[in-house]
Structure formats: C-alpha cells, structure tokens
C-alpha cells in the first residue's frame, strides 16, 4: 500500500470516528513498512499482523487498536 492509499484509509477511519460515516480502518497484514502515520487517529483500527517496521507512528492515537502480531521493529512510537 502506498502513502496516498494509506492516507485515504486514515481519512475514512477518522471520519468514521467523528460521525459514524466513513469506515473503520482494516489494515490487517498490510505492508506499511516506513509509512508515515504520525498524528493519525487510529483509535480502534485493525492492524493485526501489519508490517509497521520503520514506520513513523509518532503522536498517533493507537488506543484500542489491534496490534496483535504487528511488526513494530524500528517504528517511531514517540508521544
């Protein structure tokens, strides 16, 4: 998944969180290596088994996100 496609998924997820429209992010088993997810609101997102190695997750909201078996090796988790 490229950054532009990921940005669309995040936008729809954030809309789902705000008003129930849009859709919950299902990024399970996605290759998000080195993706920029900084400041993204991923509350409740499905990230099971995702490759997040080297991803920028700084200041992202990961509350209630499912990160089971996700690869976070080298990910930026500041904030």
Where do the model's predicted regions map?
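N-terminal capping/linker segments that flank leucine-rich repeat
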Residues: 1-26
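Short, intrinsically disordered, charge-balanced linker/junction segments flanking boundaries
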Residues: 7, 75-79
């Amino acid at each position: 998944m490229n950054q532009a496609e990921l940005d669309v998924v995040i936008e729809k997820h954030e809309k789902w969180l705000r008003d129930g429209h849009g859709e919950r992010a299902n990024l399970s088993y996605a290759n998000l290596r080195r993706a920029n997810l900084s400041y993204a609101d991923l509350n409740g997102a499905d990230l099971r088994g995702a490759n997040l190695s080297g991803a920028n997750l700084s200041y992202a909201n990961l509350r209630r996100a499912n990160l089971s078996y996700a690869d976070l090796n080298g990910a930026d988790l500041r904030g």
